[in-house]
């Protein structure tokens, strides 16, 4: 191999690295700007995140109050909101920079096949996060608050022997509440990526609807394991997570089956489809 040939092959690599550097800088710049913006408005963001717990407490006639257990807790809550919120805010820009880096190396038909999944991924994440925030969190918090005891509960009769016991009431920590809420929201957002990921694999021919259906029982075990890992360590949270993930898995099978039928119809029209029976005879 001559020196000239080495130089010719090295040039495209250097160009790719330069392009990668440019895209990373754009993505990081967008993230930094988003982090600064979210830090400035961290208090309204945190107030928005407390709506589910405040509504659950209000339904029980209790005041909504979260405490600073540690002196530095408020600062770290603001930092966490800035970092997580900044990533969520900058995610479309990060995805766009990823696409700008990958797209030049794809054929036109590959771009048409891949672009819908690139758009669907953040959309499904935000759908999962919204589903968690507006539906799952109110249900979960109402369930958890049901374990309060004593006259802290609105309408409880203090003269009732059943209420003459140690008062067990909710005294929330800002940091712990943020951790719990973001863990729920992120978990549901990530789990809502399942149809996107499996459909993309089906589009690429790496998985089939029949294969996904045949490993359903193993998938159930995997879903239960994931539910136990990504949710708080209580049965109710894990059951809620599994009840959402499983329909997504079945929906993924349906989408992959539709892709397979569309591919088969196209190949039959082109005369390139080979039936299994014909393949066996050959």
From Swiss-Prot:
Protein name: Sec-independent protein translocase protein TatC
Protein's job: Part of the twin-arginine translocation (Tat) system that transports large folded proteins containing a characteristic twin-arginine motif in their signal peptide across membranes. Together with TatB, TatC is part of a receptor directly interacting with Tat signal peptides.
Main location: membrane
InterPro entries: TatC
Keywords, comma-separated and alphabetical: Cell inner membrane, Cell membrane, Membrane, Protein transport, Translocation, Transmembrane, Transmembrane helix, Transport
Entry-linked Pfam families: TatC (PF00902)
Protein's membrane topology: Multi-pass membrane protein
Keyword Amino-acid biosynthesis in record: no
Lineage, highest ranks first: Bacteria, Pseudomonadati, Pseudomonadota, Alphaproteobacteria, Rhodobacterales
Annotated Gene Ontology cellular component terms: TAT protein transport complex
Known partners and oligomeric status: The Tat system comprises two distinct complexes: a TatABC complex, containing multiple copies of TatA, TatB and TatC subunits, and a separate TatA complex, containing only TatA subunits. Substrates initially bind to the TatABC complex, which probably triggers association of the separate TatA complex to form the active translocon.
Spans through the membrane: 30-50, 74-94, 117-137, 184-204, 235-255
GO molecular function: proton motive force dependent protein transmembrane transporter activity
Matching NCBIfam families: tatC (TIGR00945)
């Amino acid at each position: 191999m001559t020196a000239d040939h080495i130089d010719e092959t090295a040039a495209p690599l250097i160009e790719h690295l330069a392009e990668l550097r440019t895209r990373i800088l754009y993505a990081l710049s967008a993230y930094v700007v988003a982090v600064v913006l979210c830090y400035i408005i961290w208090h309204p963001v945190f107030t928005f995140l407390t709506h589910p717990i405040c509504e659950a407490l209000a339904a029980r006639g209790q005041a909504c109050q979260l405490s600073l257990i540690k002196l530095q807790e408020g600062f770290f809550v603001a930092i966490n909101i800035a970092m997580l919120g900044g990533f969520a805010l900058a995610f479309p820009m990060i995805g766009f920079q990823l696409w700008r880096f990958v797209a030049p190396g794809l054929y036109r038909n590959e771009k048409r096949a891949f672009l819908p999944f690139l758009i669907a991924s953040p959309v499904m994440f935000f759908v999962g996060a919204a589903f968690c925030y507006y539906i799952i969190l109110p249900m979960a918090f109402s369930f958890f608050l049901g374990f309060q005891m004593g006259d802290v509960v609105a309408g409880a009769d203090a003269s009732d022997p059943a209420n003459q016991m140690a008062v067990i009431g909710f005294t929330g920590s800002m940091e712990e509440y943020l951790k719990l809420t973001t863990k729920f929201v992120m978990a549901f957002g990530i789990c809502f990526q399942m149809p996107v990921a499996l459909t993309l694999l089906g589009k690429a021919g790496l998985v089939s609807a029949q294969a996904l259906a045949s490993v359903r029982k193993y998938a159930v075990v995997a879903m239960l394991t994931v539910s136990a890992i990504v949710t708080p360590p209580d049965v109710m949270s894990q059951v809620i997570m599994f009840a959402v993930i499983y329909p997504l898995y079945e929906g993924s099978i349906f989408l992959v089956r539709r892709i397979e039928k569309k591919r088969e119809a196209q190949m039959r029209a082109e005369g390139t489809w080979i039936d299994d029976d014909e393949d066996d005879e050959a």
